Amino acid sequence: MLPEKSVRNYISTILQEKDVPEKFAAIAAGTLARAYFNQDEGCMEIVTNTYVKKEIAKKLGLKSPGPVGSGLNKLSEAGFLKCVENGVYRFNPAYFGNRPWAEVQEIRIQKCFGAESNMNILAKYGDDLVEFKEDSAFLTVEKSSRAFS
């Protein structure tokens, strides 16, 4: 499991790639901390209601759940979350994996600049290395044979 500081740094980095303000990093991390793995869909998911938003807000030191709701909307607009029903959000596996987030032991980002810029994310789960490629589609996940060093 990644330390909380590493999770925050990772989230800040991927938000910066999509020009999402830094203030939403705490909301993304707080939401991810309360999310569970939906095995049927192969992604992390959270069901939010007023109580859950209040709890996330309280943990972040916010006075009301309003900023949490706004943050979820902003994260959805940027493609990090997908609202599948009212109050049900799925985390984009291209950024958060297709396995339980708690199993991630290490995560790396590689940014390539050129005629076509892209960003590759490598996550280490136990002995497995999984590469997530940024794509316009919500889900692009591939198993990688690359060494993680």
Question: Which residues make up each language-model segment?
Answer:
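N-terminal intrinsically disordered, low-complexity, charged/polar
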Residues: 1, 125-149
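Short recognition helix of helix-turn-helix/winged-helix DNA-binding domains
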Residues: 1-51
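Intrinsic disorder/low-complexity segments enriched in polar/small residues
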Residues: 6, 111, 143-144
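Polar/charged alpha-helical tracts
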Residues: 9, 13, 42, 54-60, ...
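Short, flexible coil/linker elements and helix-boundary hinge sites characteristic
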Residues: 16-19, 61, 114, 126
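Winged helix-turn-helix DNA-binding recognition segment
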Residues: 36-95
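Short, amphipathic alpha-helical interaction segments positioned at domain boundaries
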Residues: 97-131
